[in-house]
Regions:
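Contiguous beta-strand/loop segments that form the cofactor/metal-binding neighborhood of enzyme cores
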Residues: 183-254, 273, 283-294, 327-328
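Short, Asp-centered acidic motifs that coordinate Mg2+ and/or phosphate
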Residues: 31, 51, 67, 147
């Protein structure tokens, strides 16, 4: 496989994780861009990066850049996605990949028009344990899926300027942590949910700080999701089938799953991969998609999850400034 040259736009916590993963893989993190020049310089020195850019467009116009990783706040993603894709760059973009379905559709069309790969950096889809579980489910050992339960809760001190609660930064639980829970649901469900019921509590800033969501698809498979920015919960996902259930803790980057079989109650513990290598798996899968010219990094799931989040926010009447009057 060719040695691809990467650029990272944004050098916060997750940007540092990507750089460390690139080092572990012996990859080529060739350039960095950040709105604060001094921060970008420090980042480049720390990781031995050749090029530092102050302007995103300079990254996009650099012919030596093959893949751009975007880890800026998610309300800014679309403004970087479109010019990067139009410049012929493959893009791996942090979750949530866009604010709404309309933005994602625009980005997807742009990627298709320019023959490049666009993917969301959703760790869950690339962890080896999920691929192993998919094989188990396909074998029929668990029977048909019936129900999924999801929890994800963090405790954040309320601060109107913090990105979690700031409407101008597209804050709220759904786009930040709910995207993981919905991605889990979509991975295990046989088709997209088409019925949605939900309740939400909004923060004083107008973003969602706590929510309960119920989903069902045409096969009768159901899921419940509990999300909160004010109550710590275990990151627990449970998928129940006719013949047993799968339980996964720390599901965004899981490497272990426990399967309990209904008939006799015995349990199997599956282990695959490593939580510490989550971003390495993303990088490898992205480079593989680029090498084979395919949009095969779970893009269909990304689209379905974005459609769900857009519909849920429409139920809540929650919009962001960029949407000019309505979630799209």
């Amino acid at each position: 496989m060719p040695a691809y040259r990467w650029a990272t736009l944004g050098c916060g916590v997750i940007g540092n994780e990507l750089a460390q993963a690139m080092q572990a893989l012996g990859g080529n993190l060739y350039s960095v861009g950040n709105r604060t020049h001094e921060k970008a310089l420090s980042f480049a020195e720390k990781y031995g990066i050749a090029k530092v850019y102050d302007k995103p467009e300079d990254i996009f116009s650099d012919p030596d850049v093959d893949i751009v990783y975007i880890s800026t706040p998610h309300n800014t993603h679309i403004r970087y996605l479109l010019p990067a894709l139009a410049a012929g760059k493959h893009v791996l973009c942090e979750k949530s990949i866009t604010l709404n379905s309309l933005e994602l559709d625009q980005a997807r069309r742009c990627a298709d028009e320019h023959g490049v790969v666009l993917a969301e950096a959703m760790t869950l889809y690339h962890m080896p344990i999920y691929k192993q579980l998919a094989d188990l489910i396909r074998s029929g050992a668990l029977g048909p899926l019936r129900f999924i339960q999801m929890n994800f809760g963090s405790y954040k001190e309320y601060d109107m300027n913090n990105r979690f609660f700031n409407r101008s930064l597209a804050g709220g639980a759904l786009l930040d942590i709910g995207v993981y829970a919905l991605s889990f649901v979509r991975y295990f469900m046989s088709c997209q949910p088409d019925q949605i019921a939900s309740q939400v509590r909004l923060a004083p800033t107008g973003v969602d700080e706590q929510a309960g969501i119920l989903l069902q698809n045409r096969e009768g498979e159901m899921a419940t999701l509990s999300l909160s920015l004010h109550a710590k919960q275990p990151k627990r996902g449970m998928a129940a089938f006719d013949k047993g259930y799968i339980e996964i803790y720390d599901y965004p980057r899981a490497d272990t799953a426990t399967i309990t079989y209904t008939a006799d109650g015995h349990q199997d513990v599956l282990q695959a991969g490593s939580q510490a290598k989550a971003l390495q798996y993303e990088i490898r899968d992205m480079e593989d998609a680029v090498a084979h010219g395919g949009q095969d990094m779970c893009q269909a799931y990304t689209k379905d999850v974005m459609d769900l989040m857009t519909a849920i926010r429409q139920q809540w009447g929650l919009t962001y400034p960029e949407e000019e009057g309505g979630a799209q």
